[in-house]
UniProtKB/Swiss-Prot annotation:
Gene3D superfamilies: 2.40.30.130, 3.10.310.40, 3.30.54.20, Bira Bifunctional Protein, Domain 2, Threonyl-trna Synthetase, Chain A, domain 2. It is found in: Cytoplasm. It catalyses: tRNA(Ala) + L-alanine + ATP = L-alanyl-tRNA(Ala) + AMP + diphosphate. This is Alanine--tRNA ligase. The lineage of its organism: Bacteria, Pseudomonadati, Chlorobiota, Chlorobiia, Chlorobiales. One of its GO terms (cellular component) is cytoplasm. Zn(2+) binds at H570, H574, C673, H677. The gene is alaS. CDD domains: AlaRS_core (cd00673).
Amino acid sequence: MNSREIRQSFLDFFDRKGHTIVRSAPVIPLDDPTLLFTNAGMNQFKDVFLDKGTRPYVRAADTQKCIRASGKHNDLEDVGRDTYHHTFFEMLGNWSFGDYYKKEAISWAWELLTSVWHLPKERLYATVYYDDEESYLLWQEETDIPHDHIIKFDEKDNFWEMGETGPCGPCSEIHIDLTEDGSGKPLVNAGDYRVIELWNLVFIQYNRQADGRLEPLPQKHVDTGMGFERVCAVMQGKASNYDTDVFRPLFDRITEITGVSYNASLDDPSDIAMRVLADHARTLTFALTDGAMPSNEGRGYVLRRILRRALRYSKTLGCSEPLLYRLVETLAASMGDVFPELRKQQQAVSRIIRAEEESFLATLDRGIEIFNELIAAVRSRGTTVVSGDDAFRLYDTFGFPLDLTRLMAAEAGFEVDEEGFDRCMKEQKTRARQDRRDKQHLKGDEGEWTWFSAERTSVFTGYHSLEELASITGVSIFSDRLLVVLDRTPFYAESGGQCGDRGWIETAAYRLRVSDTRKDGDMIVHLVTEVRDSVSDGAISPADLSFDEGKLACRASVDRSDRQGTERNHTATHLLHAALRRTLGQHVQQKGSFVSSERLRFDFSHFARLTSEELAIVESEVNEQIRSAEPVVKHQDIPYDEAIARGALAFFGDKYADRVRVVEIAGLSVELCGGTHVDSIGQIGLFKIVSESSVASGVRRIEALTGKAAEVLLWKEYRELQDIRQMLKLKADEEVIGRIAELADSKKELEKQLQVYRTEALSGILQRSLDAAESVGSIRFMTLRLEHVDQDSLRQAVLALREKDPASTGLLCTEEDGKVSLTAFAGERAVGEFGLDAGKLVREAAAFVRGGGGGKPEFATAGGKDPEGIQKAFDSFAASVREKVSAK
């Protein structure tokens, strides 16, 4: 059976047993930000096992896409070095949610393996948990497996747990003996490749308590998993998963690209490289298809490490060009019938991978050179350890992940000081955190605060009101500013990319202008930069303030216009995010933002510069949505799971509380967000993109204006356009762009003609100077100082002169703003018969103007920074020419 037939026969078998065949969940678990990648078939049913969700069926089966490349379940380091580890694999599985249990699970597994797939019964072993007598007896009663092939093991091998607490239970594994003589019983659960696990049947029947006790679950579940690639190898009689038809199309394509064949050797470097490339191409393609993006953090960095590891191995095959992106089409062709999303996203995924490959290849060769220099230095010191500082330099400067440096070091017989690397990484993060703190300028040093209340918290009331009667609970006074904490405040503190509110705090004695608002733990801190007397309105220095404990009551008022501008821009970022995902693809994720009353900035994951057409589509869609004037609904304090059920996006690495705030625009956008927003998107008025740029590899930035600011910009651009029309004397129906293009072409042609005239004029000057120059034998040589000459014209004139007079040589000099430029030439006879070398001559002369340079014997240039030495340079040149020619 080929792999397609094996997969389909599994699904058909359980379909006949009354199971619902469900689609594979994405490898990016969008509803579980605690998980990097989907790494088991049960992930999509986790809520059922935790009794937090249900399904409209009680029996299910599927083939699940899985990635294990980080954390506890991590096969990355072993991929390529053996013939069965993968970072991407399929997991065949069947489940029962409170329906059938051990009897059916065991008998059906045996039926499929022996009656449908006809695996030899005498080669199969069943392992059970030593305390699970029920399963032990069922294997004897419900199957015809030899009784001495049922083996008991302890908790380490045959007891499954979701975590330290929660659902758990015994499991029964089915192993197959692949030894030549069938003597593999002692190798069961021994980690030997000759006796491998085929299928794991997990019986979830307990709930582990915090104190370690096992309490029976009210409902018992079945969760099974079987590695698809592994069962294909067994069914097809192959020694390795990589020898099956699952991988053959990829190997054939790699051979087509590189000319290197796959020979299934365990130790051959080329075969190791091909296994790595095939595996990593699968991981990258499926992850990116399901919405992941390479980046410098979280799952994005895991993918970037995988890609860079693969590129390093591609060098083994003599490949110095991007290769992985060319395997996406192969995967889409070979697996797109099972996973149609591969074909749908093929072009986008290819572009992302190619952009990543090109970016890293630009630094890979230089990084390898530096690595080789480091190894040579380490070897010369008589040690075998690459320092953590050096490993961190490769990471920080050339983008080498630690595991790539570790791999290269191991190949050279060296180790890496990983503790030193971790120390360097922590120091960098500490510096970054300190830099961020230094930029805030809001925290007073301990002891500078004066507190009027034991409470160190502030209640935010600004979602519903821009004014609040409050009491001052703490102040920190500096010479030029004042920090104020209130017990309750309508001022929004900078958070989630939204800048802090501005406005006024008024007491009986003072009016305090708030120019920024930040958070400090549970406190909201108001930065005051202007203080005025409440009666006279005169300015007061913050250092002269005094607060009477009996007069701490105040009115806090947010600048309404400022807040409304910020709300317009914040809601616009939600619309922009949604429009980008619809236009560019689901791989787009917010990577950062800044929202103020003046403008918005939105950073997002994407692999290439947006075209003008894409920007126009995004901008048009956002404005179309604004015109719909849909209400903006804010769901306050709802359970996180309910927010996800509403469609709110959750991303790995983001921290969410159990209860969250959701901002929803029906049919357009649902986001977890604590910021302030307009009540209707129609209040945004207008949206205008002003720039699109790169922030980092794989991260783009859009800056935009809304409302009045966008209108002002458009009117400014319109007036400028009208001024241009007037300058060009164009009628209303005439195109501006066409006329400007004509003028640009005309300007270019005139510049060409001017260049010709300059060169001709300069040629005349040089020829006259050469005609009047000194001769040594049959060689004429000149030294000449020129002014206001462009280097292109000079080069053309000099080359023409040496062609016209083969027995000539010269040194020309220009000087501008203290910088000296030297140009030397030598004609064909001067070079061939007399051995003159313009490169050597100009290098000698440049020493007198404190510079350097060189070039070919026929033509060379140099630069310097000492105009006082120009005459000495000329004299040196003349002396060298006389000496060289006279010697002939």
